[in-house]
Amino acid sequence: MTMAMQPQTLVIKIGTSSLARPETGQLALSTIAALVETVCKLIGQGHRVVLVSSGAIGVGCSRLGLTERPKKMALKQAIAAVGQGRLMRTYDDLFSSLRQPIAQILLTRRELIERTAYVNAYNTFQALFELGVIAIVNENDTVAIDELKFGDNDTLSALVASLVEADWLFLLTDVDRLYSSDPRLDPDAYPIPLVKAAELAQLQVRTDSTGSAWGTGGMATKITAARIATGSGVRTVITHGQKPEQILAILQGANLGTQFEAQPRSDNARKRWIAYGLVPTGKIFIDAGAVQALKARGKSLLAIGVVALEGEFSATDAVIICDPQGQELGRGLVNYNCNELEKIKGLHSEAIAAVLGYVGPDTVIHRDNLVLQEN
């Protein structure tokens, strides 16, 4: 690929299944060393690299002699605090041996929900790129709450890729590519080398959603991550975590792993934030006429097109917009709370003031705050 010859922004996510030995949870130092060497080669070629690394809880469990991953949130958070220091020390030792500076960035969903924090995070990553520093990112497990957790580092890596406007997202896992089903369990499983943008939304494969004994991800979360990343214009690759050097070959055009074609990237960073940075708090169901107005004519969503709603949300919250079949059409920032919208749904805009007793916005969701899914 000719684009691979130019300096690119790369996000590389390595999972616990690749970082830790399954029988003990201890760090697989040979794999980490190979990853570090690969990343340094990428930097040497002029690429900008962010590394999203799992493993803090797994390493903490090993450090404390625990034989299984804890279930309780407080215990997981405490163990993550133990493991994160050990994990970063390992990275720092290995990168320092190659004279490569690194930085630690711990994120929660809050940093992506709040627009100011989102922009600040973007600026921090850009400054690190300019300094030639590799950012090593993990979820801040020690302070994250359930409502503001990414849930898995596959999702985190996709959102980071969207945030930094990456060209590539590499998801390193314990298989060499995506298969029609788990090849470790199904002898008839066949490899899927390429998933085109139009195919990804309908992709149905039998996957193990449980992940490894020490991690939280599985192939299902990687497909979800691919949908987020490719929707943000980021080409995504699933490849083997124990062979990180394959990243170099893939950038040169090698047919390795499974590649997910990227959709055209929106130049509007704020709309990417609405689509992927925010956590929707409700759903709005619209009629066929409203669907046509939004998709074909680029209009704002009006109250007359709203037929039902779901969830509790406030004005300016992110909501999912659904078509008459209940399929997600897009996302946007709503101008009314759920109680107000329940009263005015189906009404013409000029009738809203009489029903609410005050003058509100003409639109339920303005087109500037609306992001439609690609077909």
From Swiss-Prot:
Keywords: Amino-acid biosynthesis, ATP-binding, Cytoplasm, Kinase, Nucleotide-binding, Proline biosynthesis, Transferase. SUPFAM superfamilies: Carbamate kinase-like (SSF53633), PUA domain-like (SSF88697). Its main location: cytoplasm. It comes from the Bacteria. The keyword Transferase applies. Substrate binds at residues 54, 141, 153. Pfam families: AA_kinase, PUA. It is found in: Cytoplasm. GO terms for cellular component: cytosol. Residues 281-359 form the PUA domain. It is an enzyme of class 2 (transferase). CDD domains: AAK_G5K_ProB (cd04242), PUA_G5K (cd21157). ATP binds at residues 13, 173-174, 216-222. One of its GO terms (biological process) is proline biosynthetic process. Its EC number is 2.7.2.11. PROSITE patterns: GLUTAMATE_5_KINASE (PS00902), PUA (PS50890). GO terms for molecular function: ATP binding; glutamate 5-kinase activity; RNA binding. It catalyses: L-glutamate + ATP = L-glutamyl 5-phosphate + ADP. Pathway: Amino-acid biosynthesis; L-proline biosynthesis; L-glutamate 5-semialdehyde from L-glutamate: step 1/2. The keyword Cell cycle does not apply. Catalyzes the transfer of a phosphate group to glutamate to form L-glutamate 5-phosphate. Belongs to the glutamate 5-kinase family. This is Glutamate 5-kinase. It comes from Synechocystis sp. (strain ATCC 27184 / PCC 6803 / Kazusa). The lineage of its organism: Bacteria, Bacillati, Cyanobacteriota, Cyanophyceae, Synechococcales.
